[in-house]
Amino acid sequence: SIKNITKNTIFVIEASSYQLEYSKLFKSKYAAILNISPDHLERHKTIGNYISAKFKLIENQNSNSIAFVNKNDKRIQNKIKMNKYKSKIIKVNTKINEKFINIFHNEYFLSSSNKENLSFVIEIAKKFNIKKDNLINVVKNFKGLNYRQQIVFKNKNISVINDSKSTSYSSSMEMLKKNNNIYWLLGGMPKRGDRFNLSKNYYHNIRGFIFGVNQKKFILDLKKKIKIKKFSNLKNALN
């Protein structure tokens, strides 16, 4: 609650490109940009505009600030090279050793996107002098966030995963590569510039159940790649 806020309270804010685009006053002591892929182009129009919006996080910082950026993301590194920023830039290597991942015994971090998230957690934890044992304990017991690769049911035969936060093909790739015999429910609003770039090696694992008013667009994108069925709404798809 507000009553418990002190000068040492740490606020963690997930700021979207929409919020950052026109931001002039928002300034953080620590900032992190994990990755950049073509997204929200229906608003930003170009990938360049989208990158500029995300980099407001760093542009608004001062010399006492620290920015964590993905060392392995070409778009991020190109932007860093082309500009000078006041804050200290820490480049995070997201290629975590598999043996290191096994320390945590948490299947949530087996996907490459969550390995990427974990690599940032580790680097930021170092800056806050968090003890290694405390970090390991927290990560071991982390259950994940709602709607983000969230396992809502599991037995020996089936896992039901809610990944509805993935609102584009690119953000869905990890789940499609990570699992076998996938029954993929998809609908909603297609995103401008979005491409289904999954390797052909995974096509045989996936069956698409497409629903909603925009199903024609999804069918056009997927019909030559994976087996699909179409439905008028989610209820019919589930039945």
Each model region followed by its residue ranges:
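Nucleotide phosphate-binding/pyrophosphate-handling subdomain across enzymes
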Residues: E107-N205
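C-terminal helical cap/extension that packs against the catalytic core
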Residues: R195-N239
